[in-house]
A protein has these predicted regions:
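Helix-biased detector of long, well-ordered alpha-helical tracts
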Residues: 1-172
Length: 172
């Protein structure tokens, strides 16, 4: 009932600067930027505005959720740039389709490693958590454009997280 636009980009990179989703190694740390469900939060707020108003949500709260497309935003380019400049990044993956759960699976599968994840430590904004509860959605499985899963050498993790924070990008 509305147009949908899909795009793809290609580019060139120096081989030594290429970070693949298949580069995760046993013992690496995982960092999640911005949080789960950024785009899903905006979609729900935009598509369910009238229903949310009926459920007691204020217009300003719905507007805040709808604005997740621009703040924190659905591009993870800056996240990747900051992380790779700050320390040893071994793998990166954009958990858009299928959310963070699928992104974690794809990282592990591509890298042929297992993962030990503390789900409670992953970033989840209050707005996203509440909308998921409202509509019976699992935050781990909703579209998460804007977030980035980053594999990091443990010796670099703290430097990467601090650099992201200095750049105004939340990370856990």
């Amino acid at each position: 009932d509305r147009p949908i636009v899909i795009g793809q980009m290609l580019g060139e990179v120096e081989p030594e600067q290429l970070v693949r989703s298949s580069g995760l190694r046993p013992g690496d740390d995982l960092i999640l930027t911005k949080g789960m469900g950024i785009e899903a939060t905006a979609i729900i707020a935009r598509d369910k505005r009238e229903d949310l108003l009926k459920r007691g949500y204020t217009s300003s709260r719905i507007d805040r959720c709808a604005d997740f497309l621009s703040d924190p935003g659905i591009s993870a380019v800056r996240d990747a740039q900051v992380a790779t400049q700050a320390g040893r990044v071994t793998a990166m993956h954009d958990p858009t389709e299928g959310g963070v759960a699928t992104g974690l699976y794809e990282l592990a599968s591509a890298s042929d490693v297992g993962l030990d994840i503390n789900g409670d430590a992953l970033l989840l904004m209050e707005e996203t958590d509440q909308l998921c509860a409202e509509y019976g959605l699992d935050p781990f499985g909703i579209i998460s454009s804007g977030a980035m899963l980053i594999g990091a050498d443990p010796a670099s993790t703290e430097d990467i997280v601090h650099a992201l924070a200095r750049a105004g990008i939340a990370a856990s």
